[in-house]
Amino acid sequence: VALVWLRQQGEDRYEVRRAGNSLRLYTNGVFHSQYNSAEPVTGSVWDLLLLPAFALRSGRPSRVLVLGVGGGAVVCQLNRFLSPDLIVGVELNSVHLQVAREVFGALASNVCLLEADAREWLAHYRGPGFDLVIDDLFGHVGGETERAIAADASWCSALWSVVAPGGALVMNFESEAQLRASALCRDRVIRRHWAEAQRFSTPHYANAIGAFFRQAPEWERFETRLQVHPELDQRRAQCRLRYSRGLCVSHQGLCDPTVKGGLGRRLPQVPSRALHHTRNALLET
């Protein structure tokens, strides 16, 4: 594994290493992001965060909000497969943003990367809603990754406030148990906001991805939309997409997962400082 980029900032050491054709971002030895432009689908968590968008009734999210950019893998995947009109990425760590722009190549004209605390940014945001909101806010403690913001009623309500009609909220959890314990599954008031809740997972990671839809998703068109892209077409032997999905909760109570297909995991950083700024002209387009 070759070291291709290094930054020491105070006590924090940031490295980008090349493993084969993949670039990997490490912060203090903790793996945060991976992307390979030649093989953008790896069977990891980044695939899971992307997949729910293919079930939206619109067929494609026009406006996307990513909370926890890390090295920008999800941003690159979104543009590779869905080409939204706008992707807003909010990231607390300035070095991660530098890596996303300069190393991972998250530089497209439709991408607006902001250095900000996710909680502060949401509290101040007054623009239009987003068709897809991705919460991938992770930090690390003692060399282990963990969610940076608890999925309690306050945080989940703040997230729902920026999900557009017909949109979806996608959240990365450390485990299925953590997903099911979240306010999105347990709080009866918050549960009224969504029409369906799905759980995505992969055999390679313990993470569970929760996808909460404002309108009933189009699963009957889901596979057809994936198959447009060779990298997402599981009929092809070279396809690395591996996932399972199923209802994680219904309006009547918790349900058992069902359908198999293919998915994975990932990790960002801890929001603790308020670094707030917004490009209103871009966000309101």
Named regions from a protein language model:
Residues A2-R18, R24, H32-S37, A55, ...:
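SAM/dcSAM-binding transferase cores
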Residues L6-R7, R18-A19, A38-V162, Q178-R186, ...:
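The AdoMet/dcAdoMet-binding core of the Class I SAM-like
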